[in-house]
């Protein structure tokens, strides 16, 4: 918008994009790009503009697991497969068939897996009883969040539209005022030109009258 607003302390913002014409004319965009390129070449930074900042620590948020994984990737080692041993029920080895400790470990493993399956069954029962309602409540919360977000979005869009309308009306008003002032300026310049031409013409007439008066005076003196 035209006015006295300053950018960077010295630049007067006088663009009226809703009023000005000619931006789509051939060569205008290329000329603007050339001016920008010239400005960037003229003020290209001569040093690292981040030199005043401390050296970044990229490992600040790394965990032990992440570091081990990065080391594995850097050394090109294959990914360790997921162990399925906990889901198996192996019997004692042939050489340990008479070892009570080996059989006890197998029994403990079986009990742990049975307990795990029992917990899974309980979770499935809870899911069958309360899962539908919980899912409905979750969906209702999502719909409420979406509705609130949509309302906020509509408010923002309305604010943006109102602001654009205000800018457009202000710029069109300023543009009409500028056009009126330009027309007045052209009219005043034309009038000044007419006045100057009339003055020059009158000066010439006065000069001619003086010359005639002088000639008449000489003729009278001759008589």
Curated annotation (Swiss-Prot):
The keyword Cell wall biogenesis/degradation does not apply. GO terms for cellular component: nucleus; U2-type catalytic step 2 spliceosome. Disulfide bonds: none annotated. Its main location: nucleus. GO terms for biological process: mRNA splicing, via spliceosome. Keywords: Coiled coil, mRNA processing, mRNA splicing, Nucleus, Spliceosome. It is found in: Nucleus. It comes from the Eukaryota. Pfam families: BCAS2. Residues 139-223 form a coiled coil. Component of the pre-catalytic and catalytic spliceosome complexes. Component of the postcatalytic spliceosome P complex. Required for pre-mRNA splicing as component of the activated spliceosome. May have a scaffolding role in the spliceosome assembly as it contacts all other components of the core complex. Belongs to the SPF27 family. This is Pre-mRNA-splicing factor SPF27. It comes from Xenopus tropicalis (Western clawed frog).
């Amino acid at each position: 918008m035209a006015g006295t607003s300053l950018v960077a302390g010295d630049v007067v913002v006088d663009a009226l994009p809703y009023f000005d014409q000619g931006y789509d004319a051939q060569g205008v965009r290329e000329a603007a790009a050339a001016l920008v390129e010239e400005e960037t070449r003229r003020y290209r930074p001569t040093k690292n503009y981040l030199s005043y900042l401390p050296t970044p620590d990229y490992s600040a948020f790394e965990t032990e697991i992440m570091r081990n994984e990065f080391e594995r990737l850097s050394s090109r080692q294959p990914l360790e497969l997921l162990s399925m041993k906990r889901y198996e029920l192996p019997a004692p080895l042939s050489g340990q068939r008479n070892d009570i400790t080996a059989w006890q470990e197998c029994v403990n493993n079986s009990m742990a897996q049975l307990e795990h399956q029992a917990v899974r069954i309980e979770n499935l029962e809870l899911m069958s009883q309360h899962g539908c309602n919980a899912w409905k409540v979750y969906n209702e919360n999502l719909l409420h969040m979406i509705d609130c977000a949509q309302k906020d979005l509509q408010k923002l869009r309305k604010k943006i539209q109102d602001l654009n309308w205000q800018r457009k009306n202000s710029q069109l008003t300023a543009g009409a005022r500028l056009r009126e002032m330009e027309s007045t300026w052209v009219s005043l310049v034309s009038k000044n030109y007419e006045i100057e031409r009339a003055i020059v013409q009158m000066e010439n007439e006065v000069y001619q009258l003086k010359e005639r008066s002088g000639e008449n005076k000489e003729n009278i003196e001759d008589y």
